[in-house]
């Protein structure tokens, strides 16, 4: 493959911006960019001349990004095979701006070797220049906006990355931001919270949104597309991101196209600093690349048993979900968990959590009524080696009982929609008011609630007059507020109401909630919680940025990151690194299977939601355990201590959970057995033969009567693979992966010898990526450390570098 010439943007008309660009052109002379090749040899691309018809190639792992002379992406090439993965007939600039509410596209692009910078420029109409610094990393490349130059009077509102139109959609990891087939994977990852991994609701026409399949996995909980880098389309897939400028007051559209006023934030909230990573990879190396990106770019990197949570078996571990967990019974609950081989107790407490109210998240009496009381509960469970988790409702602010955020006087930082002034005075007893604008009462926000000063007022009818809007059917003094008179001209704001009919915290409150959730981990010792209802942080108008601010802010407030499980109601690209898993419940097993297809596509652990075992037969409980073994999926076993303490079958239930979960976590079931367990028409029972080592698996009918002969289930003897690693080529990107035959592996370590200089070994995934600098034979020993009582595995490998 050869590089076509690259334009230097010559021939633009004279002007201030043109002179700036020409001054910069002196350090943009011809430069060789190396497109990292396959093991058979590196491919090099050279800028040969400066014509407008040129093409620039930029390596990003095994992906070669081809830009034409205008800065449009015209090639997405697997540099190993030469195959172009761009969707035929589709291309957009890598970077575009929205200036003065008009889409502005570059007319040229230039590379500067002095600072590794791509300059996207346009001197016609809305003149601008965007500098993007490109850095080659280990298997990926980063792209960061370092400068935006335009007319000082212009309003740079949004920066758009792509979308990159990809021709394949065999597997689309929406939240992970990865599109792949059996041969190649292409990924885009936002590298900070301000770079939102999604597409702005305001510009569907610029991002092929009409072609997007909103819910390709048929998730019942919701479509994940509004918060996702990757989206499946009718012709392939797109990878996209954007950054909104919040240095000025903005309006952002919610899911119902309602405009929500936001900001302004500080001067750092411009589009400068928007940053993404791009990469192409063999499919089996994607988790290794994502691990290197997270660790190399200072993204959240939670671990389970010291292993990155995205590849840790412990991320999919089961728990006991006990509706009546409290300080009096936690000791017995922990002993039950021990008997079942379960490490986590979880308090859902009416699907809200053990709180006096949501918002400030102070513990209620079930957890001792204070942080100190809750800490004692946690310590009691810890004596049995069991950790405690709690349910939260993210930035839902409860109004019954009222949280201090809504108690008079209500916090001014509650999330609000549009505003308009009173056009007439309002008395404290009136059931009608008049507005000088329509925005506060237009459709598009849950419920019909207004805020005037510190009073919350609901309404049920709106009628347009000649110069004002009549709002009637008022119910005064809602949410514990006090009816009050208000003068003409007083602002009236629409209140953004959550799906539980309470308030939602705005950005300042979101930050405080994140700090509070950090405290319950650091001080109290809580090690597991769910961000239920987290879409509310997006409904504030802040979109993915709002969700990331809460979830990643909570992570930042933690003083330790090992062994903490976080679940979510929405899996988003910007919070993917922090979140351990989703665990969506449903009574329909087909839906749970579909959920797990989504989890697998996004490198998330298998989960089967909460499963209420109260009063169920042992056969029905084992049937769900069999499905969990088939999918390698954890389960939230929901019940009450009242039931477990009174039921005669409790010891048998606990033992069955222990046997199935132990065998699952060791990888004891064969692929053939897992396929049989997946069949929803079947029921099974599992009995221990040698504790922790072997079991007898028996198919049964609905009454528990055996069908056919029993099968042997055995813990695997740990082994490493493959037997031989591929040959490497000096100066060319190399990728390989050491694997084990058990999910119980928690660490890969080079215990003797060493890799070729330039290669990096990932201890969490077993992946090897890099560009070897020297020829020769390099021999080393890899040791896999295993959990669950399994022996460690060792193998000696040699990499030949030619």
Go through each PLM region and give its residues:
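Solvent-exposed loop segments of extracellular immunoglobulin-like
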Residues: 743-750
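C-terminal edge beta-strand
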Residues: 789-802
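Carbohydrate-recognition beta-sandwich/jelly-roll modules
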Residues: 57-349, 380, 387-388, 527-528, ...
């Amino acid at each position: 493959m050869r590089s076509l010439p690259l334009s230097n943007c010559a021939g633009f008309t004279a002007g201030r911006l043109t002179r700036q660009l020409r001054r910069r052109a002196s350090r943009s002379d011809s430069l060789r960019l190396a497109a990292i090749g396959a093991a058979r040899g590196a491919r090099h691309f050279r800028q040969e001349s400066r014509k407008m018809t040129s093409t620039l190639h930029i390596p990003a792992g095994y992906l070669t990004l081809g830009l034409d002379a205008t800065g449009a992406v015209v090639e997405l090439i697997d540099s190993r095979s030469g195959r172009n993965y761009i969707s035929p007939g589709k291309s957009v600039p890598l970077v575009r701006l929205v200036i003065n509410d008009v889409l502005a596209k570059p007319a040229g692009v230039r590379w500067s070797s002095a600072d590794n910078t791509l300059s996207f420029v346009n001197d016609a109409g809305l003149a601008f220049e965007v500098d993007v610094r490109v850095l080659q990393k280990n298997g990926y490349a980063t792209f960061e906006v370092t400068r935006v130059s335009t007319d000082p009077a212009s309003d740079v509102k949004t920066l758009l990355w792509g979308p990159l139109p990809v021709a394949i959609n065999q597997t689309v990891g929406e939240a992970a931001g990865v599109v792949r087939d059996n041969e190649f994977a292409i990924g885009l990852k936002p590298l900070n919270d301000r770079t939102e991994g999604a597409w702005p609701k305001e510009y569907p026409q610029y991002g092929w949104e009409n072609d997007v399949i909103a819910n390709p996995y048929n998730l019942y909980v919701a479509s994940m597309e509004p918060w996702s880098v990757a989206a499946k389309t009718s012709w392939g897939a797109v990878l996209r991101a954007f950054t909104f400028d919040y240095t000025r007051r903005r309006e952002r559209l919610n899911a119902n196209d309602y405009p929500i006023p936001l900001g302004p934030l500080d001067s750092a909230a411009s589009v400068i600093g928007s940053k993404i990573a791009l990469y192409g990879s063999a499919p089996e190396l994607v988790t290794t690349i994502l691990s290197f990106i997270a660790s190399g770019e200072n993204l959240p990197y939670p671990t389970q048993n010291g292993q990155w949570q995205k590849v840790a078996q412990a991320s999919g571990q089961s728990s006991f979900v006990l509706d009546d967990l409290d300080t009096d019974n936690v000791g017995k609950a922990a002993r039950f968990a021990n008997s079942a081989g379960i490490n986590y107790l979880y308090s859902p407490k009416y699907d809200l959590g053990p709180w006096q109210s949501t918002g400030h998240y102070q513990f209620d009496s079930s957890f001792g009524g204070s942080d100190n009381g809750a800490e004692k509960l946690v310590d009691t469970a810890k004596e049995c080696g069991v950790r405690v988790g709690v349910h939260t409702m993210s930035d839902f602010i409860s109004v019954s009982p009222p949280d201090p955020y809504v108690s008079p006087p209500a916090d001014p930082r509650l999330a609000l929609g549009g505003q308009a002034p009173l056009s007439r005075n309002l008395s404290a007893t009136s059931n009608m008011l008049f507005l000088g604008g329509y925005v506060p009462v237009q459709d598009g926000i849950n419920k019909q609630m207004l805020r005037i000063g510190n009073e919350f007022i609901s309404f049920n009818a709106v009628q347009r007059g000649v110069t004002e809007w009549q709002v009637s059917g008022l119910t005064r003094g809602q949410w514990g507020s006090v009816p009050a008179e208000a003068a003409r001209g007083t602002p009236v704001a629409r209140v953004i109401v959550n799906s539980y009919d309470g308030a939602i915290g705005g950005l300042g409150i979101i930050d405080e909630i994140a700090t509070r959730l950090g405290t319950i981990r650091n001080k109290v010792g809580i090690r597991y919680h769910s961000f239920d209802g987290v879409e509310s942080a997006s409904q504030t108008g802040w979109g993915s940025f709002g969700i990331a601010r809460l979830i990643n802010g909570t992570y930042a407030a933690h003083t330790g990151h090992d062994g903490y499980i976080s679940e979510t109601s929405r899996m988003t690209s910007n919070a993917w690194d922090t979140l351990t898993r989703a665990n969506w419940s449903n009574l329909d097993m087909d839906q749970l299977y579909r959920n797990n297809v989504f989890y697998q596509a996004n490198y998330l652990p298998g989960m089967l939601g909460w499963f209420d075992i109260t009063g169920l037969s042992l056969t029905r409980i084992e049937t769900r355990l069999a499905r969990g073994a088939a999918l390698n999926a954890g389960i939230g076993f929901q019940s009450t201590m009242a039931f477990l303490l009174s039921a005669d079958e409790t010891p048998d239930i606990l033992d069955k959970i222990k046997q199935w979960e132990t065998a699952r976590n060791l990888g004891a079931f064969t692929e053939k057995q897992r396929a049989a367990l997946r069949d929803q028409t079947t029921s099974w029972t599992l009995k221990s033969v040698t504790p922790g080592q072997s079991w007898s698996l028996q198919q049964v009918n609905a009454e528990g009567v055996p069908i056919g002969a029993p099968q042997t289930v055995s813990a695997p003897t740990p082994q490493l693979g493959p037997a031989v690693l591929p040959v490497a080529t000096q100066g060319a990107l190399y990728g390989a992966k050491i694997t084990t035959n058990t999910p119980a592996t928690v660490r890969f370590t080079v215990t003797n010898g060493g890799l070729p200089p330039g290669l990096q070994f990932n201890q969490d995934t077993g992946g090897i990526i890099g560009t070897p600098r020297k020829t020769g034979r390099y021999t080393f020993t890899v040791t896999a450390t295993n959990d669950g009582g399994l022996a460690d595995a060792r193998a000696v490998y040699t990499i030949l570098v030619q």
